[in-house]
Amino acid sequence: MCGRYALYGPQSRLREAFLLESCPEYFARYNIAPQSRVLVIRHPPGAGRVGQLVRWGLIPSWAKDPGIGARLNNARGETVAVKPAFRGSFARHRCLIPASGFYEWQAVAAGGKVRKQPWYVRPADPDGFFAFAGLLAAWKAPDGETIVTTCIVTTAANALMAPIHERMPAILRPEQYEAWLDPANHDTGALETMIGPCGSEAMCVSPVSPAINRGDVEGPHCIETVAVRSSPFE
């Protein structure tokens, strides 16, 4: 799963990386949690790629209770084409979710107890971004307001991530962006082939402070490397 991530750096660099025609202003964030407003990238019909701020936590268009969104932060790539909550969005409403890095928690046995050690995962290119495969949905509230929401598609961990957690976000390569974003592309079979673990060489990992477990902790210190007693990479 992916329950926290970060997005920071000059907006000009993000616009260049994703070839955006327009993008709303956003602020650097180092501990983005579900139910936050997050930046996604879409490719509307007849236009170029655009950035849009939406809520993280998918509310399917048919949902009676918007509270379902709190449970739909992630969509397993293996079943995204068939699960009722996701299959419509997968076929017709896909997006990219840009990230400077993400967090995963490793279960560590210590003194007869199990604690969770967070790790920060960032692109091997220090100026790069990850592009998470994402889904979108628009839900109309009883008062007529339309709420647009998103979720992150996940996949099995690659070799680098496996010692930390069994799941990770599905990260797309630049040459896959257009097919994933194309609103006219309904070939779910071909789309499913894009969902898989990216190569370990594309990322770096480092342990960070458990302080990020709190959703109100924010700032560059969130991604600073800390010392740990034992590491699965030693």
Place the predicted regions along the sequence by residue.
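Short linear sequence motif anchored by a di-proline
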Residues: 1-234
